């Protein structure tokens, strides 16, 4: 009698501990002995209904975590109950061997249930739960038969859907991916529920009313079967839709690839055409630029050539004018030394003295009468040359030059400015050349026995000429300087030609040329 009372107290305490754990912990094996198999059925059906309700809101991660937590809680609760039972047995100290054996068996059962495998107890428990096991087996057989029927129907529906695949429109890849994810999530949830149902079924508290439990079990079975059928239909539809979408996507991708390839070819052609156009445009621009540059160069060459021609014309005009200036004094300078030389060779000193006197008179006066007098003198010279045919052969080219000089002077009788320049150049050349054609004794200031007074007369007009020449040089411009330089050069050439005729006086003439060059340089420095 004591053992029965103690056992009842332990059962009450264990029920209180199960209530505190919010119904998530597993009951002890003793409670299973007390209650009927109908209570177990009710608890299983309630667990299934609650699990189906909360199915849609759960996720994979939450399910996994909940399972681990529940297993840990169940293991902890079982260990706590074991400890409490051991303490109570230790305090009371009076228990029968039968109770000890039952405790050992029940501990083994708890361990097997924590691992997810349910094992029926031996002895009396087998007789108590045999009826519930048979009923569970019958329920499972009925559900299996219904599942087979639904499978046959689903196969027929799949065939019909495969026929209607071609008619349906194309769905995007995004829809396919979303549907595939949903189907996978649902399949995983179902599998997890199937594993979790047997573990949770044992953790619920039993209810006393047997009639209510039977009704709820029947309604839940019907609901579960209907839901299963709907789920199977949804799976088949989604799988068929995914197959269609994949086929259509492949066909669409092939068509889009063909279109894309055609578009790419068109784009490449356009790019090539544009590149060709650009190249042609650049070539045309280069050609135009080359043409423009060539035309500009030609124009520049033409302008430069025209300017060069103008400069050449100006230079040629200036050279012609300078040539004219050169020619006139040269020819006139050649005349006077030839007269003097011829007069000295013939021995007519009076005629040689009269020629420079007339030239000085011409320098003083610029009237046409002086010009006429010059012409008369030239004619007289020609007559003297024709009369004196016994002269040396060296004098013959000089006579031709004299004729040319006479013609030029007759052709240009009215040029006043040229006569002025000629008169200046004549005076300069006379200064440089008269001492050359003196007698040797006169250069050394030695006079002839008959003509000392004549030498004095010559020196006076020479001094008078030098003063006049200096005054004219101060007034004259740079052009006269050039003419003086040219005249000095001409006089040097004439002196060289005369040196060939007169080898006796070469040393004296060289000394005079050096003196003349020195005097010319000094004059330039003064200016």
From Swiss-Prot:
Q: Which GO terms describe its biological process?
A: cellular response to hydroxyurea; chromatin organization; chromatin remodeling; chromosome organization involved in meiotic cell cycle; DNA damage response, signal transduction by p53 class mediator; DNA repair; forebrain development; meiotic spindle organization
Q: What GO terms fall under cellular component here?
A: chromosome, subtelomeric region; chromosome, telomeric region; condensed chromosome, centromeric region; heterochromatin; nuclear chromosome; nucleus; pericentric heterochromatin; PML body
According to its UniProt entry, this protein's organism is: Rattus norvegicus
What is stated about domains?
Answer: The ADD domain predominantly interacts with histone H3 trimethylated at 'Lys-10'(H3K9me3) (and to a lesser extent H3 mono- or dimethylated at 'Lys-10') and simultaneously to histone H3 unmethylated at 'Lys-5' (H3K4me0). The interaction with H3K9me3 is disrupted by the presence of H3K4me3 suggesting a readout of the combined histone H3 methylation state. Contains one Pro-Xaa-Val-Xaa-Leu (PxVxL) motif, which is required for interaction with chromoshadow domains. This motif requires additional residues -7, -6, +4 and +5 of the central Val which contact the chromoshadow domain.
Protein name, as recorded: Transcriptional regulator ATRX
Q: Which GO terms describe its molecular function?
A: ATP binding; ATP hydrolysis activity; chromatin binding; chromo shadow domain binding; DNA binding; DNA translocase activity; helicase activity; histone binding
Q: Which residues carry this modification: Citrulline?
A: 184
- Biased-composition ranges, Polar residues, are 14-23
């Amino acid at each position: 009698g004591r053992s029965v009372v103690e056992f009842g107290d332990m059962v009450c305490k264990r029920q209180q501990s199960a209530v505190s754990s919010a119904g998530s912990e597993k009951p002890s094996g003793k409670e299973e002995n007390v209650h009927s198999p109908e209570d177990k059925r009710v608890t299983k059906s309630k667990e299934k209904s609650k699990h189906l309700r909360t199915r849609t809101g759960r996720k994979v991660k939450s399910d996994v975590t909940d399972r681990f937590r529940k297993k840990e809680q169940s293991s902890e609760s079982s260990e706590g109950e074991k400890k409490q039972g051991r303490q109570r047995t230790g305090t009371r100290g009076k228990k029968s061997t039968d109770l000890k054996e039952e405790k050992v068996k029940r501990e083994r059962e708890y361990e097997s249930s924590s691992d997810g495998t349910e094992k029926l107890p031996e002895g009396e428990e087998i007789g108590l739960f045999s009826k519930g096991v048979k009923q569970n087996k019958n329920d499972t057989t009925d559900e299996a038969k219904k599942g087979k029927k639904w499978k046959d129907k689903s196969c027929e529906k799949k065939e019909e859907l495969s026929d209607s695949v071609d008619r349906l429109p194309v769905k995007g890849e995004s829809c396919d991916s979303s549907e595939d994810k949903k189907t996978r999530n649902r399949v995983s949830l179902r599998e997890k529920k199937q594993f979790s149902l047997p573990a949770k079924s044992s953790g619920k508290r039993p209810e006393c009313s047997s009639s209510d439990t039977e009704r709820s079990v029947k309604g839940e079975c019907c609901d579960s079967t209907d839901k299963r059928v709907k789920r199977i239909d949804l799976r088949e539809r989604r799988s068929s839709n995914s197959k269609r979408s994949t086929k259509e996507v492949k066909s669409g991708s092939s068509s889009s690839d063909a279109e894309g390839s055609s578009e790419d070819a068109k784009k490449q052609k356009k790019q090539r055409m544009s590149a060709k156009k650009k190249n042609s445009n650049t070539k045309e621009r280069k050609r135009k630029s080359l043409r423009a540059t060539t035309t500009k160069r030609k124009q520049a060459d033409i302008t430069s050539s025209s300017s060069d021609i103008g400069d050449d014309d100006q230079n040629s005009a200036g050279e012609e004018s300078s040539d004219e200036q050169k020619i006139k004094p040269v020819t006139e300078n050649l005349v006077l030394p030839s007269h003097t030389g011829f007069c000295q060779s013939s021995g007519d000193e009076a005629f040689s003295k009269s020629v420079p006197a007339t030239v000085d008179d011409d320098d003083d006066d610029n009237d046409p009468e002086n010009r006429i007098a010059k012409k008369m003198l030239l004619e007289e010279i020609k007559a003297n040359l024709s009369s004196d045919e016994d002269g040396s052969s060296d004098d013959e080219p000089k006579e031709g030059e004299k004729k040319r000089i006479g013609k030029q002077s007759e052709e240009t009788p009215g040029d006043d400015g040229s006569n002025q320049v000629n008169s200046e150049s004549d005076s300069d050349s006379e200064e440089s050349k008269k001492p050359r054609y003196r007698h040797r004794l006169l250069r050394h200031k030695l006079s002839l026995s008959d003509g000392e007074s004549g030498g004095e007369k010559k020196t006076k007009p020479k001094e008078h000429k030098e003063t006049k020449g200096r005054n004219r040089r101060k007034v004259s411009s740079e052009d006269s300087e050039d003419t003086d330089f040219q005249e000095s050069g001409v006089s040097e050439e004439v002196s060289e030609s005369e040196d060939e005729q007169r080898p006796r006086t070469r040393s004296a003439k060289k000394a005079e040329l050096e003196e003349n060059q020195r005097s010319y340089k000094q004059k330039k420095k003064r200016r």
